[in-house]
Amino acid sequence: MITGFNLSGMTPLEKQRRHDNMAAIHSKNTKPELIVRKYLFAKGFRYRLNHNRLPGHPDIVMRKYRTCIFVNGCFWHGHEGCKAFRIPKTNTDFWENKIACNKQRDHQQRLQLAKMGWHCITIWECELKPRNRMQTLVALEYTLNHIFLCDHSKGYAPFQEYHEMAADQRQTDENVE
């Protein structure tokens, strides 16, 4: 009988090392999330973090804009067409299922948020790489301003078109007298 191995084929030391590696992967305060938060704060936007009463616990919640921002890792959320999203060669069935479930969960949460009247914006990790970062952040700022203006614009009566100019109207009034 071989000692030191469990049924999964890993030694207790390997199992502890894997546990430590997985524990080091954080879901809050990630580098991409901090980049977005720092930019928004510098531009005067105020927000809440990981709102626990909303589906999916959005990374950034902007109540004034009724907008939730999700900063997603390309691998964990299955960013199609991205170089950072590749299914590992080992245990592929597990990873395909895991990522498919993550994508399905993300989709359902965004549908719930939309039904509640929230706008959802997803920013991918690869969009915050140095060469694309500024373009992404400026587009985010533009989108937030657009959302605010659309949601808060007043509905005025449609502009009434006059076919005569004011001077023409005055001349016809003088001719009548």
Model-derived features with residue positions:
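Nucleic-acid endo/exonuclease domains
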Residues: I2-T122, C126-E177
